[in-house]
Amino acid sequence: MSTPRCFGWRAIGVAAAVLARLPQRATLAFGASLGVLLRPLLRRRWHVARVNLALCFAAESAVERERRLRDHQRSLAVALFELLRAWFAPPATLDGLAEVEGLSLLRDAAAKGQGVLLLTGHLMHTELATRFVAEALGAPVGGVVRRYHRHPCLERLLDAARTRRLGPTVGKFDTRGMARHLRNGGRLVYSADQDFRDGHAFVPFFGVPAATFVGTPQLARAGRAVVRFLSMVRGVDGRYRVRVCDPGLDALLDDPAAFAAQYMAVLEAAVGEAPDQYLWVHRRFKTRPPGEASPYVR
């Protein structure tokens, strides 16, 4: 990061570290203001969100769904600051912000030398939830699945921040590296509500068939890991409730379709606690059953 061509990114990293130290009240206020500014922008993303909300909350009126979209826009803007907090905030600035439940599930597995596949989903502040778990454990969570960025300076900046605060990172498609990490007794945070087109089953998500990756049980078996679920909700007071739970997936490792269905049911329940905090701009329903057109085509 000290090379001249990365100097600009170093400056961005310094600015991000400053923003990550903002008091929570300021973070929420800035996020709300930014959410308003974003409304005329990102029109393609808002179209995706509108389609998703129409599918998942079909019983609601258009007015009610627009209210949900506005809430989502505000939460999405706040989540940008939450990402910075996850990566750059000093531990002292996080004190008292979160209540973490279910740590005993992680400690029990560690005592047995067993890896933990910590499933989550496209919840917009998963990395901050991971950071809170790391702070509560007093050590990095252990492993974060991530995508790679094309710009080498951005890649180095984000990977260094994640590694320092959350734990070592594993590439999104490095399944061997993931399994090896789990076999060594590590924890791996993984958003498996993915649509990879190949290797999926259609299972209900808010009553809508959603193409869901069915390779997750194989990863858990290859890593000889138990499967747990991580979620977080931001309350109206700005404090967070982080929860690690047993989603009942260990018994379904030999039935990938049933595993995917149960996983989506658990994720749906987590989303239902704070619907504005799910990443509705994600094209969750882009792959459809045979004969059904993409809902995102205008």
Question: What kind of feature is each model-predicted range?
Answer:
Residues 112-172, 198-201:
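Catalytic core of membrane glycerolipid acyltransferases/transacylases, capturing the structured
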Residues 51, 131, 160, 218, ...:
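Surface-exposed charge patches
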Residues 92-98, 163-170, 206-207:
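Short, flexible loop segments at the rims of nucleotide/cofactor-binding pockets, characterized by
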Residues 96-99, 123, 151, 171-172, ...:
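A conditional alpha-helix N-cap/helix-loop micro-motif detector
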Residues 1-120, 125, 156-161:
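Membrane-anchoring hydrophobic helices of lipid-metabolizing enzymes
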Residues 2-3, 7, 38-41, 63, ...:
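Non-catalytic C-terminal accessory region of glycerolipid acyltransferases
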